[in-house]
Amino acid sequence: MTQLAIGKPAPLGAHYDGQGVNFTLFSAHAERVELCVFDANGQEHRYDLPGHSGDIWHGYLPDARPGLRYGYRVHGPWQPAEGHRFNPAKLLIDPCARQIDGEFKDNPLLHAGHNEPDYRDNAAIAPKCVVVVDHYDWEDDAPPRTPWGSTIIYEAHVKGLTYLHPEIPVEIRGTYKALGHPVMINYLKQLGITALELLPVAQFASEPRLQRMGLSNYWGYNPVAMFALHPAYACSPETALHEFRDAIKALHKAGIEVILDIVLNHSAELDLDGPLFSLRGIDNRSYYWIREDGDYHNWTGCGNTLNLSHPAVVDYASACLRYWVETCHVDGFRFDLAAVMGRTPEFRQDAPLFTAIQNCPVLSQVKLIAEPWDIAPGGYQVGNFPPLFAEWNDHFRDAARRFWLHYDLPLGAFAGRFAASSDVFKRNGRLPSAAINLVTAHDGFTLRDCVCFNHKHNEANGEENRDGTNNNYSNNHGKEGLGGSLDLVERRRDSIHALLTTLLLSQGTPMLLAGDEHGHSQHGNNNAYCQDNQLTWLDWSQASSGLTAFTAALIHLRKRIPALVENRWWEEGDGNVRWLNRYAQPLSTDEWQNGPKQLQILLSDRFLIAINATLEVTEIVLPAGEWHAIPPFAGEDNPVITAVWQGPAHGLCVFQR
């Protein structure tokens, strides 16, 4: 029987060198680690890892080849009160595995036990890691490196974006390949998108609770193997990595960046009643934040929280991020529940992972976007991330909806959000692009649902409509649900136009939710994380071409306005912005706080956004000059308007002089 050589303690994971495979695994509290390899017949062969350098266990298996399936059994104490839950009866996934064979099914054998260990062996049904070799021809691929000031983000789901697209070949719809298909790339280019932000593509599992209800985790925020691509999005699991990189290469050639939504805050092992896949059995005490009673700190709402202040976990997270940049050429990351990244346990800008990213010559050069909160006390950290990070700006989302749909926001508050929320982000040398402005995202109502539903309708999620937020700031315009009279449809359309214009012509970095540009609805479901069906898949056959053209025209207009693309804070008198009332005069203090919802925003001294957010048609006196309405608010041939615009109720228009 082949014996393991000691091998090397780095890098982490399984690496083929042409002669064999080096295996390394971190565990600070293990007493023994067994490498378990499986032959073509499924027969298991076990080897003790002979090397033990600090907290790294390692060994080298001569003659091992790519395609070898493996896992680990880790021996150590079962002391739940101390945070130790070692159970060598359970086969464990390598945290750095780059491919997984098998499915993460709801099975009692995939649990380690709660108070007492479950010593039933699970190797027969446990997913296995696969050794991969990395050979790929990137040709002349180069990152687009779009300046932040010119960035337009499009948030999309790999499957949902393309699964129903009639012009993409059936056999590749819903896959990585479809992202790189010319039809999709041409669409993104025509729309004006510069960055495609993908919901999680690292391998994830569906929670046992969902599986028992016949549902699945659709969004992907339940990670199980952070270095492995989710195989369900590949035409073939064995070629997933090549398919993904082919798509990135094609997108790069078109000048489109790729940003990955990544989940470093928790794992699919959930709470103590959750499954055992990997980290809990390898070194529970090190990988997770553990309470004094041995249970998890649940700062994520998902049952556990990764301890990103632990040096080994920081190394793991950093290696994961570098892998996606160096191996897959991704251009940035959006970090889910990113306040966890800064917990020590208190949130700190100089937390270990932030410092590691700042000091990394690879990671410090890509786009970094934080979802700047978690659910723990002190978890709301909007505006408090280190300067390298941009942040989701929920202030903007709520203000835009309140202004146009609830009519309860003063002009001053609206203008502050329009100006990149400088009261929040203008600090520590940060630029306006640090504010990722959004009106909608995957989490919440779609844009169409914002104007069609007053209340969430999440019954299909199986929680009796308890899940999902109740704070939607939506307005159904008098009738709950889709459809209605022509007048109702037109009023809803006008509100959509107003919200899109506010999003795409405000200072900061705009993020558009895929499907909003053609009227996609989730029928009032504002938490569709478990709906892998036509509720979430974009129906291109029903797409509103008029709304798509309107959105594209706004994006292309944005790119013409220096005040929006130069990425400099607006200062009084610098020519970037003037705030005027309905009479083209500067607003008084009282008008900012108590005046009617009528406003003119003059950008770069040439572009004028005239707003009438009142219930009545109102005359808006334009500033001096010869003005004409510009697309998408008018055709190419427009009469000159010298004095007054008849502003419709809840309307706006953009002019140029």
UniProtKB/Swiss-Prot annotation:
Keywords: Carbohydrate metabolism, Glycogen metabolism, Glycosidase, Hydrolase
Metal-binding keyword on record: no
Cross-referenced SUPFAM superfamilies: (Trans)glycosidases, E set domains
Functional note: Removes maltotriose and maltotetraose chains that are attached by 1,6-alpha-linkage to the limit dextrin main chain, generating a debranched limit dextrin.
Protein name: Glycogen debranching enzyme
Domain of life: Bacteria
EC numbers: 3.2.1.196
Pfam families linked to this entry: Alpha-amylase, CBM_48, GlgX_C
Species in which this protein is naturally found: Escherichia coli O8 (strain IAI1)
Region (Disordered): 458-479
Compositional bias ranges of the Basic and acidic residues kind: 458-467
